[in-house]
Amino acid sequence: MTETASSDVNAGIAEIDELQRLLMRGTGPGLRGQHFKQHGCVFATFEVLADLPERLRVGLFAEPKVYTAYIRFSNGAQIDDTKPDIHGMAIKLTGVAGRKILEGEEDAATHDFVLADKPVFFIRNTSDYVRFMAEFARSAPRGEPPLAFIAWLKENRPEDLPVLLGFRQQVQDSPLAARYWSQVPYAYGLGNAHACRYSVVPSKDNLVSSIPSEARGPGYLREAMTDHLTRAARPAVFDFRVQLNDDTSATTIDNPTVEWATPVEAVARITIPPQTFTSAAQLAFGDNLSFTPWHALLEHRPLGEINEVRRRVYLSSSGLRHETNQVVRREPTGNEHWSFNMRLSPEELTAGINDDFKAVLAKLQATPPIFSRGVRRTPTGSWQKARRAASRRPVSLKPTCSCLAVSSRSSCAIPRRAVAPTTAHAMGLPPR
């Protein structure tokens, strides 16, 4: 099991990178080359389970712990959710200690898992990937399938043809009710004894879409998430599972087109709490996040040629996207602030406020309103004086923060009706 790329592999990856950039110029280099339509980027917790067997207590899963996570759900290529496609679930854990393997980001405190709603990938190696991307770059702008690659695959790898033809054929009821797989393998430990694949399995209690199939529009998958997390205010729960394999030969590692027959075991639980996730700021945050399987601890390093392709192509396309959008690419800390759950108690709302101010709030709450039950009450005393003073005071519409400026030329992506979270500025959100 080796991760050292040969000169042929390096040349192939460089060609794939150039083809990917060509595709991005077609869709707009400010967008992701793949999975550019997101349904939502949500806050979640990732809880490593207690009492795991010894062989599973490795790296990230060595001890029980709860991580803050961001999860981005997306379509692979389609704008219209009603059309069949591959769908993505990208998970970013924050607060993960330990040195990471991505060059230049070894000290980052994040760890990524990149998954899709199909258990296997349709490409075996770099040379096949080059052939596919070259044909795809020619056919995609015309809205046509890569017919030349399909013909080549039928002749040379007929067993892989059903994998390719079925790859983008999923129609989801809800992103929260689907199963997802890593497709490609990863190490499980510092040695070469075990490889693994990851999968995410939804709880049976996760709601499916309440939108009947005949009423589904091109954006119904985000609506399904909103129905579940915001309107019904229900959590979405998933098992995070690993599938270990003792066969770490190149035949197994470099063939992601075949499912493994080994057992699948739960090692963590993902909980997405009820939340509102559709603000302009949070959607922009999700668009600006970069996910790569190489944001990882050494114990969980990506294996095989396809992961080597992803390492360089993901990094290159992410760099192009952020440069085009004039956004600095930064990893999140887990302390980004949005109103994930608007149902706050009075105690939570007044946390950190001193007692004097709480007393003022209590006094205001106890004061009878000027208008009550349709009967107009005449203000007296200090209330009357305050009203007269207020009526003489000029009203200023100038915002206290440039982010809230009325001008449509504002470059801040924070909604003007809300207080701008400072961490959103730190993430460098682009113009709307």
Swiss-Prot record:
Keyword GTP-binding part of the UniProt annotation: no
Gene Ontology terms for molecular function: heme binding
Family annotation (CDD domains): catalase_like
Keywords, ordered alphabetically: Plasmid
Coiled-coil regions, chain positions: none
Keyword Ribonucleoprotein listed: no
Record InterPro entries: Catalase_sf
Lineage: superkingdom: Bacteria
Entries under PANTHER family matching the protein: DOMAIN PROTEIN, PUTATIVE (AFU_ORTHOLOGUE AFUA_5G01990)-RELATED (PTHR36195:SF4), DOMAIN PROTEIN, PUTATIVE (AFU_ORTHOLOGUE AFUA_5G01990)-RELATED-RELATED (PTHR36195)
Descriptive protein name: Uncharacterized protein y4iL
Provenance organism: Sinorhizobium fredii (strain NBRC 101917 / NGR234)
